[in-house]
Amino acid sequence: MAKSKLPRSTPAARAAAVPPPRLAAAAQQQHHQQQPPSTPPAPVPPTKPSVAGASTPPRSASPVSNHDTDSVALSSAKKKKKKSKSKAKDADFIDDQEYELQQAAALAQRPRSPASLAARAQAQAQLLAAASELYRRIEGDAQGIPDDDAYWTSLPAHLRTFIRNALPLGQFPPAAQAALNENANDPANRHASTQAMIAVAQQLAQAAHASQRHIQQYPPGTHPYPPLPFDASIFADLALHPDQPLPLHPHPNTANNAHPTNVNGAYGQYSSSPNPPPTQPPVEPLPPPVVLYDNFDDEIDRFDDDGVDDAHYYDDAELDEDDEVLEADAGLLRARNRVWMQEGANHALRPNGLATHPDGMRSASKNKKKKKKKKGGAGAAAGHGDDEAHEIELEVPPPKPVPNHPPPSTNVSSVARNSNPPPPSSRAAGKQPMTFNSTGKTPARPANGLPPSSNSGKRSVSSSTHGHPPAANASANNAKIWSTSSAEERERIKEFWLGLSMKDRQKLVQVEKETVLRKMKEQQKFLCSCAVCGRKRSAIEEELEVLYDAYYDELEEYANHQQRWVSSGGTIPPPPGPGPFPGSVALDASGAVIGGDPLSRTRAAHAGRDTRHTHTHTHAHTHTHTHTHTHTHTHAHQHPHPHPHGRKASLHPESSDGYDDDELDDDAEYDDDDDDADYDDEDEDDDVELEKERAREDYDKRNPVPSARRRGTNDSNDLFGLGSSLTVKGGILTVADDMLKNDGRKFLEMMEQLAERRMHREELTNAELAASDDEDDVDGPDDVDDEDLDEEDEDEEDEILTEEQRMEEGRKMFQIFAARMFEQRVLAAYRERVAQERQLQLLRELEEEDDNEKAREARRMKESQKKKDKKKAQREAKEAERLKKDQERAAAEAEVRAQQQAQRDAELKKQEEIRLKKEAERKAREDEKAKKDEERRRRQAEERERQLEVERKRREKEEKIRLERELQEKAKRDREEAQRKAKEEQQRVQRAKELKAKEEQERKAEAAQKEKEARAQAQREAKQAAAAASRGASAAQGVPSSPSTGPKAGSNKAANASTPGTPARGGKNGSVTGPPTVGLGQDQVQPRGVHSQRSAASSKHAPGTGGPNAAGGLAAAVAASSVAPAGSSSNAVGSTLPAPPQGLPPRPSTAVLTPAGSSSQTSSVSVAANAGLPRPPTNLAGGGSSSAVPPSLGFGSIALNAQSNVPMPSAKTPGSSISPKPAQSFVQPQEKQPSPPGFGAAQSPMGAVYGQHAGLDSLRSPTLSNGLQNSGMFGSNGSMSSSLQSPSLGAPGMGGMTNSLASLNLNAAPLSSPALNVGNPLISSKTPGLGMESSTPTGHNLGHMHSPTQTPFSPMSGSGSVDPMRSRTASFADSDPMSFAGIRPGSSLSQRVPTYRSGAPTPIGPIGRPKAMDAIQQHMHDEHTGAIGNGRSSSTTSGSGATSPRLPEGILGSSALGGDDDIIDPKPRRVSHTIPIGGGATGSSMGSAGSFFGGGMGGGSAVGGGFGVGSSSPWSSFSGNNPTAPGPLSPAFNGGGAAPGSIGSGLATGNFGLNQNASTPGAGSSGSGMAGGAASDPWARMSTNSWDRARFAFEQPGGNGVGAGSNGGTPSGLGGIGGSHHAHAPGSHMGHLHHQLGLSAGPGNGNGSGSGGMLGSFALGAPGSGTRNLFGAPGSNALHPGAIGSALSPTLPGARHVSGSHE
């Protein structure tokens, strides 16, 4: 195998050539030796000298070089050393080359003359103009010239000849093949054989048209810069850095030229970043300097990548070849897409073909195929670390565009920029045959080139393969990708090539060869390492060397031919082919090889056959290698082999071109190999990133794609277009393009096939020789064998001929490949030289500008200095003149100043004298003034002392006077206090006597009557109680019960005269028409109609006729809850009291007096043995009104069970709303609330309840005489309007109650009598008052509070609903109210009162005893004549006059009311604003504060007050709302219920006894009651809410008032009405005091649930009721221990306290 004929340089030699100084010197020397003519003709290639002169200086000479060319050259030398197999003469050649390079460097350092620069620039401009024109013509038809023949004829003769000679012949039809064999060199035959190849080249060239167009837009010759000395390193560097844009023009992919399809980023670095388009001098750093380097493999890869980038192709094939060769050299930096990169860097090209250059100067977009190839290239490049050392960043400014020359490169670049992925990169494009249009200029494309076509890159190969594109866009784009189509460009490149010296050419070829070889080796390193493959690699390398050596010879011969042709002026035929190198192919505008279509059509069938043959061979070969190679390798071989075989078959016919068969074969093989290597290298770059196996697989995958892209070409299986497939996708141009794209797989396959063919041919030769020997030895053993042998020989000869033809074709293919690669390299070198020239020119211009600027600056400085000096002189002259003037002026001024100074001195002297004189005077004045001030201060001090003394004396005097006055006042107060006490004591004694006398008289008078009435009433009440119990439900509904009539006492009539007798609380419940009554029980609220009905009913009943008690009547309920049937008056039996006088309920058998006149109802409750204790009304007002219980205030029998159905006399004084009515539903029928006689339960009327609480049956206080006058606490005026009717009291009325306090029957005035209407409109307005029936149902129906006032004082039937107020017990007399208080029947107050009073904070006068009350009234307002002691004052009811039994000494409270004349003088009690019981009943509203019931109904002494309604009663410490005046009888806890003194919170609003704390008017609501704010009775010791004291029974103790309401709610009415009121009335004060009366059986919050009025019946507070009853017995939590029930009456067992009523 022939070895490389090119000398190889040793590393040392190469290193010696590297240093920039030597390179520059060599370039300079070369420049001098080869001066170009001043104006070479543009169309005609310049003469060799001019071309030589045009050689570019070494890039290293550029001052912009960024790389050390020494190191680069050194590394390149190392690479060469590794790869080279050169002989010793190579070193000599390199030495010579180095010498030339040194000369060039020296020349480069020398400045060029302007003339030479201008000539060079003009020549270049002409060259570029021609190229541009050609490209425009080519680009005129985007689809390419339809008629290839026309295009072919348009080519210059020398190009056609070159194409004919250079292009290998493919497989032809038998006739054509025979003709070809006969005359292989015949131009026509060659033309016919190469048409397919040309078509392939044209189509591949289309891929570079875009780039070329761009290049033409910035043609290298358009700049005025002088050429630089030639340096082969330029080409090496360009080849190594194909991806770096040539400084000649902006790369299509640059950002500046944002060509849509610009996938080539190589130029991007140049144009976008460091270097502007070549048409403009770069204003930014230029591309890195180019380093010549023999290893072009990498650069080839880069150029291949550029080809992949489509847009990077530069029209000149030289540049592509150089780039491809450079890329083939592993040691060099890759110039993918003109991006100069270090070999070691990752050179994987981006989709735009940019390698990942460290600088990052790469386009962002690439075709997918490029990406793959770039990846492979990157991997391959990574292996070329040495390339980094070889990179010389020569940033040559792009030449300014020559105005004369249009930018033809625009067309070229646009063609080159075809974005089809497969399209060759700029280098690949350069390697593709230059398209040539000699005719017609097509309009230049814009600089950006083609519109973007993402698919164009992929289709470029196929389109380039065809004269017609597989897709219109693809062909158009392909046409635009190639920028070397300009014939002028080719001419200029040719001139440049011819201008090079032989050594330069050799060096370029050597660099190209080494680059390709390196790339091939890199590609092979991924292949199998078996021995077979190793031998194949060796064969390939040898084949490559041989091919390149042969190609160099061809180059020389071709160059010589060209030179001769040029020198001859066309007398001799031009060299074959378009040039400038053997094998160059011209492409039409569509990228198809000029004239390729006819040939391709004629050869299509032959190609198909050859392809099939090839495949057969390929498969055989593939199988052979399959065992040793990876599958990828197998595929790679499989596809490549067909084409190489085809090529070899066609190459051998070409062997007659003056090349040995071997040489041709090698050349073709190498051409194939080289082409394949180029392609392989490109693919290899992709494969580097892919796996080694994928390298082949990718190639296999790409093969079909290119075949698809190259539709219309020969069978896609024919990889390289060898033989019959010149036009297929795998054509040699494609191989070159791939190689330029750093994809050397195809090239490697081609070379492998070539090598295999050569080996096969040698084997055949050896076999033939051996066979001939064998035949000689074994000749003729058998004729048949001889015949067979002959046939075999013939076949072998045919095969040999075919093989020779293929070898010849392979040689031609390699020529095309090498031409493509070399064109690219030379083009790169040429452009680099131009760039360097431009750069140097720019630098020179810059230096000139700097020098000029410096000169101008110097001139400016000089002029400025002169001006400054002049100005300075002027300033100095002026300054001197000024100084002179200043001196003169200063002298004059000095003289003047001297004179002035003298004058000033004299003046100062004068002034000083004057000042001294004035100072002396001033001092004298100051001394005098100081003396005066001192005197004045002294006088002032003395004056102050005098004043202080006077003041002290005055204060002493005043103090003395004050003390004396105080002593006098104290003495006076003492005297007055003593007198007052004495008077009070006297008055008290007198009152006590009077009361006692009166009580005795009344009792005596009433005793018989009451006794009689009591019995009758007891019977009636028993009956009524039974009826009420049965009708409890109906009573709750307000259904009136049949009233029980009772005897009417004349006294009651009399009382009624003043105040209409309390309407009898017959079984019929007086329904209060006011707001629904709040029943203590379930039926707390009743429509007013009910109350009004009750009141009406009660009014209808004649006095003494008990209204029918509703089953729900409070008294009935109480009685029921007491468990004592209403008829159980047996307990009442035993009362020794005389029959009550008329007007009072008849006494029960226990001598409870029944007021005959006031109420006809008879107390069915017989006073128990304990009747001596005053009992709170058993009828609880507050729950549902119990009509069954006519409220009868009176201390009837306490038996709770006994319902005192004492019909109250319905006689009412006008305006008395209180008429005896059945208790309202205010008290729930007992059926609903059986156990507690709460409001919810039917209860006996208050009075009844008072006497009828369970367990209290036996507890009966002796009835008090009802002789109390009707002055009643409410006054006889109807202020209470008989709101309080205590049927038991002669005239059931608060007045009666209060007045009868002495007897505690409080019958003085029936509640219905006007006495109760203490002017309290509330009562008259049906405000139920406890125990009062007011025609006006109050919000609190006192009726519900059945006899809350049914304290013994009077039945408290509220208006309407007040019926309950009317104690169903016999009137107070019946129920013997005082018996509740512990008063014995005979005594005005039972002796038990003291027991009660034992717990009272202050002594209480005996209730009902006139004298005691007198004493009490001493503290009461005098106007309250209705005080308990003064019961007679206004009470019109006649009392029985029976005196109460003896009053044990020390006994206070109700027991003090006993008949004993001896009056226990109570200790001074707190002055209460409330009137005494019964006193001042007529006060404001019920008699403000003074009524027995405490703060009257209206104001202070309302019934509620004294009666507990207002809490003004003695027992309510907090009368009404006035907590400050606790009555002595009631510990000071007014549950905070009604206003003091109001019966509830005024009997006015609430019925009597309803002290409603809540807003609910009625007893218990303060203010709402009759008199909300009456001052508390002196006796009122407990809060009104708490009728905890026994007196509560009397006064219906009323903190809560009669219905001392719950604290929060209205205090329950009298006797628990309040408590239960709490339910209907403002929540009963249950929480605090049980509803005092305990009548509040209704659920009151006071007692717990309301039933517990303090006094269940009088809040008897049976145990279990959370409250203590009025008597303090447990059962009412609020009951104060001193309650009557607890202490007052020893006979009253606490158990008897109505606990049931307290819920």
Swiss-Prot record:
The keyword DNA-binding does not apply. Residues 748-1031 form a coiled coil. One of its GO terms (cellular component) is cytoplasm. Residues 657-690, 771-802 have a biased composition (Acidic residues). Residues 7-36, 410-419, 453-464, 1024-1037, 1111-1135, 1158-1167, 1269-1291, 1431-1444 have a biased composition (Low complexity). Signal peptide: none annotated. Keywords: Coiled coil, Cytoplasm, Stress response. Residues 37-48, 274-288, 396-409, 572-581, 1138-1148 have a biased composition (Pro residues). Pfam families: NST1. It is found in: Cytoplasm. PANTHER family: LD36051P, STRESS RESPONSE PROTEIN NST1-RELATED. May act as a negative regulator of salt tolerance. Belongs to the NST1 family. This is Stress response protein NST1. The gene is NST1.
